[in-house]
Regions:
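Post-HEXXH active-site segment of zinc metalloproteases
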Residues: 101, 117-148
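Active-site scaffold of zinc-dependent metalloenzymes
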Residues: 72-101
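Extreme N-terminal basic, low-complexity initiation segments
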Residues: 1-11
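Active-site recognition of the HExxH zinc-binding catalytic motif
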Residues: 105-117
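Aromatic (phenylalanine/tyrosine) cluster motif
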Residues: 15-18, 23
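Long, well-structured alpha-helical subdomains associated
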Residues: 140-143, 154-185
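Zn2+-dependent metallopeptidase catalytic core
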Residues: 38-58
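Short alpha-helical functional segments enriched in proximate histidine and acidic residues
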Residues: 114, 118, 153, 157
Length: 185
């Protein structure tokens, strides 16, 4: 037997936590969440599902902050943090007072914006926010192309998330998504 000091146990614990975090995510992404009035498990589950699905090999850092946003009249925000060129660090702010369905859809909506930033379709050009090289400031909020895409995809992603988490088959998914091809008929 080899004697183990308290410092060895602490360092092993931190190392184990780090390794567990990396393998649990399946990707090299790092997600933190804070605030009040939300389900930590649901927040992690949806975020990890999205990042594993769309960015399994990217190193993305996401901080999800839950706070009261009613005064601002929004359910959520997604902002890049740090460098504008190839952003990989993001802050997502979510309202704390949402039911489960609205919470998941809002988080997915903001994660779609994260994807837009990562793939480069949403970026700053000459100090203006642009989507596919077109400034979005000339549109009202509801008609901005990046918001239209996020609203369309949040519904589809919500159903995909529920189907994958509930173990539905391809046939059951095809009932809701008729444009999906079935592998085996």
């Amino acid at each position: 037997l080899v004697p183990i000091s308290l410092n060895d146990i602490n360092s092993q614990t931190h190392f184990h936590f780090f390794v567990h975090l990396v393998f649990a995510l399946g990707s090299m992404s790092y997600i933190t969440h804070s605030g009040y009035g939300y389900s930590k498990r649901l927040c992690e589950d949806v975020s990890v599902w999205f990042l594993d699905k769309f960015f399994p090999r990217h190193k993305i850092v996401v901080e999800i902050l839950h706070r009261g946003l009613k005064r601002e009249g929004v359910n959520g925000y997604c902002d890049m943090v740090g460098y504008a060129y190839r952003p990989r660090e993001f802050l997502i702010e979510l309202d704390t007072y949402m039911d489960k369905e609205l919470y998941i859809k809002t988080l997915l909506h903001e994660l779609v914006h994260l994807r837009q930033w990562v793939v480069g379709s949403l970026r700053f050009r000459y100090g203006k926010l642009c989507y596919s090289k077109e400034p979005v400031e000339k549109y009202e909020y509801w008609y901005q192309p990046h918001e239209i895409e996020a609203r369309e995809q949040e519904e589809t992603l919500y159903l995909e998330y529920l189907f994958e988490k509930n173990g539905w088959t391809d046939r059951q998914v095809a009932q809701f998504f008729p444009n999906r091809l079935l592998q085996a008929v």
